[in-house]
Amino acid sequence: MQVLVKVPGSCGELIQGKVSGKDLLVTCPINLYSQVSIKESNHNNFENINKKSFLAITRTLEYLNIKTTNYKIKLVSELLQGKGMASSSADISAVIKAIGLINNVDLSAEKIAEIAIGIEPTDGIFFEGIVAFDHIKGEVLQYLGQALP
């Protein structure tokens, strides 16, 4: 079995600040993606997996209570690093989702947020559409609608 997960980047923060004492971040997904492919293998083979993505692998496996693995995991990103395109958030969330799916667990966006927030503050780009998101606590404050195609 092979799993392929794509998570969009963003065009930067549309809104960032605090509302009623809660941190708030609104980002808009774009048509550029981080893509993770994963399949079972004879040994672990990680391609283009950086430190944060590796943490996403280990923390997701811990959550799923999986002790040993043999996966070939490849991450390919169209997103520029360090340019406000949510590249780390897209990489991390794509890895989390893929690890769940290869183990027959469809992790919710809320669970992905919980795991991702344990690694770094994260954008809510893995939620459907556009959300007002507490990027520190990993909580959706409000669903704002679908992004334009």
Give residue ranges: language-model regions.
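Predominant activation on well-ordered alpha-helical scaffold segments within soluble catalytic domains
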Residues: 15, 54, 58, 93-100, ...
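ATP-dependent small-molecule kinase catalytic core of the GHMP/sugar-kinase superfamily
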Residues: 21-23, 108-149
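C-terminal nucleotide
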Residues: 3-4, 101, 146-149
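Short capping/connector residues at structural and topological boundaries
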Residues: 16, 31-35, 90, 138, ...
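ATP-binding N-lobe of GHMP and related small-molecule kinases
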Residues: 1-83
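DPxDG-like acidic metal-binding loop motif
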Residues: 83-107, 125
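Phosphate-handling active-site elements
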Residues: 65-72, 99-115
